[in-house]
Regions:
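Divalent-cation
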Residues: 1-140
Length: 140
């Protein structure tokens, strides 16, 4: 969330009000958990709600291979100034939706650079920002 409030969309989900950490995000998006489906809304450094419903884009120019998650990410970016990060459930690939445009298949450095550019934050201020990844199912 930036200047345009996402409060109406927050209300469609479950209040969380927790500091953004990799552990929290991993737990939210773990399969077969109550918070798994839907969007997470972040304000500043806090996860404010999870399992939120977002409006789907009706942009006919979007690839037919994109599913609901990507269409919702683009949809919310078409009607608000939010930066939307989408992680494919099938492939784990990262996309960013902003102002109705979708950038796909970003690596961690590209995502970090894109976030800083959109949010007008110099990269130097957030050198320790790390992109979270789910734990490997092969490791014990």
């Amino acid at each position: 969330e930036q200047k345009v409030s996402l409060r109406d969309y927050e209300r469609t989900g479950i209040d969380v009000d927790g500091i953004v950490t990799s552990q929290l995000l991993i737990n939210i998006f773990e399969h077969n958990t109550p918070l798994h489906d839907g969007a997470v809304i972040i304000q500043g450094n806090r996860v404010v709600s999870a399992t939120c419903y977002l409006p789907l884009s009706d942009n006919l120019g979007l690839s037919k291979e994109l599913g609901t998650r990507h269409r919702a990410g683009v949809g919310i970016s078409e009607i608000t100034d939010s930066l939307t990060i989408i992680v494919s459930e099938e492939t784990g690939k990262i996309s960013v939706a902003y102002e109705g445009e979708l950038e796909r298949n970003l690596d961690a450095d590209s995502l970090r650079d894109r976030m800083h550019k959109i949010l007008n934050n110099p990269v130097e201020e957030h050198k320790n920002l790390r992109i979270w990844k789910g734990r490997s199912r092969d490791k014990k």
